[in-house]
Curated annotation (Swiss-Prot):
Residues 42-79 are annotated as: Disordered. Disulfide bonds: none annotated. The keyword Mitochondrion applies. Its main location: mitochondrion. It comes from Arabidopsis thaliana. Signal peptide: none annotated. This is Pentatricopeptide repeat-containing protein At1g26460, mitochondrial. Pfam families: PPR_2 (PF13041), PPR_3 (PF13812). PPR repeats lie at residues 154-189, 190-224, 227-261, 468-503, 504-538, 539-573. InterPro entries: At1g26460-like, Pentatricopeptide_rpt, TPR-like_helical_dom_sf.
Length: 630
């Protein structure tokens, strides 16, 4: 009743302070249309003006709430990591989810033991909750356990704390400051602890501090010894700032200790050595890696392998080229074993260059390695190009392995037996492509020539006879190089008599060259007339050799006659042939023939050039010089 009176008096006071000017004559009505609370409540009468059923026919309904039926709808779909973690598998009560972050972390620090905290940190590491991890650890170490004693972390738990600080951008100095208090908890830093510090140094490229820390780890020993990751971080750090020598020293230490290098560090080392031209250093590193079983599987990328091979071939480093081809062979093998298979094929031009480098460096291993990877790349689907076979023949010839050289020649002839005759003759010419084999056959004079001839003769009488005109032509030309006309002529006759073969144009050219070299121009002319009479078509080299035979005999006029015949046959004289002719005309003081040579040079638009330097040497008065010296 008192409250009712207080309300009535308050209303009357409001009426006195704020009268209604519009209804001053009328009695004052209460603002509320509802009775006082002490009376029984009445149900409000529903107004037909606000009935939603009246508007359903004229308005479009809203779409359903998208959050219904999908508990994951509230998560931020723009972030791969949800902001609200799931505690379905944790020991945290579900009531903590609605608390503020700080009280929740404080409550967790009071309820979780070390093992539970380790499990939670593992979950938070997966979700990258570094800030919560750092905050919870700092609160947890200041809390008491269930026995009322301060919580003490072990090294694994502390490493989680270090990782959280590292991921939050802590500097190397901050990381060192965080490692120092580990002694207060009776915890010794292990290798993983120092590796986290090294990662911070790696980001800041602090090489000197990293080297000191690495030395400290080596001195501490036991659980603090550096591992593979430690050396990778330090080596990669030095390569990143361009300190390649220091990186090589650390890598040398790691390899001597038997540590395993990562593929990235090995690739960076290879790239650095190749870029600076330190191929010998790279060979040494590769050999040390191959000596350790754990590092045998290291292999640069396919593109880098090609680059290594190119640089090694340019510098004629046969060992490095062999290792590059070995790496490529690994890639080809891995690609074939993969499902689906990945096809790798080496460039055949690179193999040819490798064989040429093997010939220059006399490396048998590079010859075998180059040919092996070429066969692996071709996969038996087609034969190698003639240039590859010829490069292989020349490589074995430079090594002095004539047996394998002639075996490769037999492979070339078998692979291209169905080719056109002109193509085969040009491909197997002893004057051009097979000339290194000719030089190898005549290296020791008649001793080597006779040995090769008897081997070919025995092969022609075997179960699978091998008869080759190209091989015999090499012997004929080799005899001509040693001025052994008798052996050259006997070998030429043996082509048809002993081997049952027909001499080709290269056979006649080699014999003609042998006669011309010993100044038997008449016999050389007879050889030319003989081959023309039996229907063998001479080539441009035949005429050039006949010109040389006349010039050796100091007969420029006859040589010019041969040149005229050469032009009539449809060939053009070479610049070298015309220069030889002019030189002989000058020395013989034959101005008439010299003018004809100049006319031929103008006709075929050949620039002869001057021979002042040759003439100076030719006109030196050596007898006067001796008289002055005496």
């Amino acid at each position: 009743m008192a409250s009712h009176l207080f309300t009535r008096s308050r209303i009357s006071l409001l009426k006195t302070l704020k009268p209604n000017p519009f209804t001053s004559a009328s009695p004052i009505r209460a603002i509320s249309g509802t009775p006082f609370l002490s009376q029984d409540p009445l149900l409000a009468t529903e107004s037909t003006d606000h009935d939603p059923s009246n508007h359903q026919s004229t308005s479009t309904p809203l779409p359903p709430n998208p959050a219904t039926g999908s508990p994951l709808y509230q998560e931020n779909w723009r972030s791969p990591i949800p902001n609200t973690p799931s505690f379905n598998q944790s020991l945290v009560p579900l009531g903590f989810l609605n608390q503020a972050p700080a009280p929740r972390i404080r409550a967790l620090s009071e309820t979780l033991d070390m093992n539970s905290l380790l499990n939670m940190f593992a979950d938070w590491t997966a979700s990258q909750r570094w800030s919560d991890m750092k905050q919870l650890f700092e609160v947890w170490v200041r809390s008491l356990d269930k026995n009322g004693k301060p919580n003490k972390p072990d090294v694994n738990l502390y490493n989680h704390y270090l990782r959280a600080n590292l991921m939050m951008g802590a500097s190397a100095g901050d990381m060192l400051d965080l490692v120092a208090p580990m002694e207060e908890f009776s915890v010794e830093p292990n290798t993983a602890s120092y590796n986290l510090v090294l990662k911070a140094m790696y980001q800041a490229r602090e090489t000197e501090a990293a080297m000191k820390l690495l030395e400290r780890m080596l001195l501490l020993g036991k659980d603090s010894l550096p591992d593979d990751e430690s050396y990778d971080l330090v080596i990669g750090m030095h390569f990143g700032v361009g300190k390649n020598d220091e990186a090589m020293k650390v890598m040398d230490t790691a390899l001597k200790s038997g540590y395993m290098l990562s593929t990235s560090v090995f690739t960076e080392c290879v790239r650095s050595c190749v870029a600076k031209g330190r191929t010998d250093t790279l060979v040494s590193i590769i050999e040390r890696c191959k000596a350790v079983d754990r590092n045998k599987s290291l292999c640069p990328s396919w593109i880098l392998c090609n680059y290594i091979a190119e640089v090694a071939i340019q510098e004629d480093n046969s060992k490095l080229a062999f290792y590059a081809f070995e790496f490529m062979f690994k890639w080809i093998t891995r690609g074939e074993m993969a499902r689906p298979s990945v096809i790798f094929s080496v460039d055949e031009g690179l193999v040819v260059a490798g064989l040429a480098s093997a010939a220059r460096t006399c490396s048998s291993s590079l010859v075998e390695g180059s040919w092996t990877i070429l066969k692996q790349s071709l996969r038996g689907r087609k034969a190698a190009n003639p240039a590859s076979y010829i490069a292989k023949i020349n490589a074995y010839a430079s090594l002095g392995n004539l047996q394998k050289a002639f075996t490769s020649l037999h492979e070339l002839e078998s692979a291209y037996a169905d080719s056109e005759k002109e193509v085969v003759e040009e491909m197997l010419s002893p004057f051009t492509s097979l000339y290194p084999l000719v030089v190898a056959c005549s290296k020791k004079g008649f001793e080597t020539l006779d040995e090769v001839y008897f081997q070919l003769e025995s092969l022609s009488q075997g179960d699978t006879p091998y008869k080759s005109v190209a091989a015999l032509n090499c012997i004929i030309l080799g005899c001509a190089n040693t001025w052994d006309l008798d052996r050259a002529y006997q070998t030429f006759e043996a082509i048809s008599a002993s081997f049952g073969l027909t001499p080709n144009i290269d056979s006649y050219n080699a014999l003609l060259y042998a006669f011309g070299k010993v100044k038997k121009t008449f016999e050389a002319t007879n050889v030319f007339e003989h081959l023309v009479s039996i229907g063998v078509k001479p080539d441009s080299r035949t005429y050039s050799l006949l010109v040389d035979a006349h010039l050796i005999n100091r007969d420029p006029k006859s040589a010019l006659t041969v040149v005229d015949d050469m032009i009539k046959a449809g060939f053009e004289p070479s610049r070298e042939t015309l220069k030889k002719l002019r030189r002989r005309c000058v020395r013989e003081m034959d101005d008439e023939n010299d003018d004809q040579v100049e006319a031929l040079a103008k006709k075929f638009q050949i620039r002869m050039g001057s021979e002042n330097r040759r003439n100076m040497l030719f006109n030196i008065d050596y007898s006067r010089g001796r008289a002055l010296n005496n």
